[in-house]
């Protein structure tokens, strides 16, 4: 859950987001070390009067500054490729939910059930109850079972949208005529908020997403009441 003046990432709720957080810290450490080294070299060049104007060739130095960046790029690329593979891999999903973007709301269809589908609109500020979040609450939440792999099929009816829930490490483009997929797995119950992350028109800012992750028993009761 995000909070005012937050400086870091949202708390990870899925295995993918945990991996992304660790990768962020790993990459940030490498960038910090490189930046410190470059600033140190620049400071030496500005403060020292020692120069090598007669140096015409330095094969050892050239070898080092060719190999070292390649090694650093490999250290960044390998964990990145691993996470990309994890995000694309979907094995035996327990549930499939089709998400369609519209100007300016989302519609959801639980494809494993015959008549379980609904539209999800933002609740206007004037209709909010005490404790509800402005521009983030919806009239119909997406209820999903926790601790189970869920496949989200994402597309659009009109223009480009993007279905994003930061605490779950999700951001998938909704493209007209194309069906993208993502995996949702939550480690704990709760409400998780997101928004459309692709500028899609004048009301782009009013397309919130709310996932309600519940135990499997509660999800079965909810789905039975919705059919």
From Swiss-Prot:
GO terms for cellular component: mitochondrial inner membrane; respiratory chain complex IV. Its cofactor is Cu cation. Residues 46-59 are mitochondrial matrix. The modification Phosphotyrosine is found at residue 218. InterPro entries: CcO_II, CcO_II-like_C, CcO_II_C, Copper_CuA, Cupredoxin, Cyt_c_oxidase_su2, Cyt_c_oxidase_su2_TM_dom, Cyt_c_oxidase_su2_TM_sf. It is found in: Mitochondrion inner membrane. Mg(2+) binds at residue 198. It is a multi-pass membrane protein. It catalyses: 4 Fe(II)-[cytochrome c] + O2 + 8 H(+)(in) = 4 Fe(III)-[cytochrome c] + 2 H2O + 4 H(+)(out). Cu cation A2 binds at residues 196, 198, 200, 204. Its main location: mitochondrion. SUPFAM superfamilies: Cupredoxins, Cytochrome c oxidase subunit II-like, transmembrane region. Residues 1-14, 88-227 are mitochondrial intermembrane. Component of the cytochrome c oxidase (complex IV, CIV), a multisubunit enzyme composed of 14 subunits. The complex is composed of a catalytic core of 3 subunits MT-CO1, MT-CO2 and MT-CO3, encoded in the mitochondrial DNA, and 11 supernumerary subunits COX4I, COX5A, COX5B, COX6A, COX6B, COX6C, COX7A, COX7B, COX7C, COX8 and NDUFA4, which are encoded in the nuclear genome. Component of the cytochrome c oxidase, the last enzyme in the mitochondrial electron transport chain which drives oxidative phosphorylation. The respiratory chain contains 3 multisubunit complexes succinate dehydrogenase (complex II, CII), ubiquinol-cytochrome c oxidoreductase (cytochrome b-c1 complex, complex III, CIII) and cytochrome c oxidase (complex IV, CIV), that cooperate to transfer electrons derived from NADH and succinate to molecular oxygen, creating an electrochemical gradient over the inner membrane that drives transmembrane transport and the ATP synthase. Belongs to the cytochrome c oxidase subunit 2 family. This is Cytochrome c oxidase subunit 2.
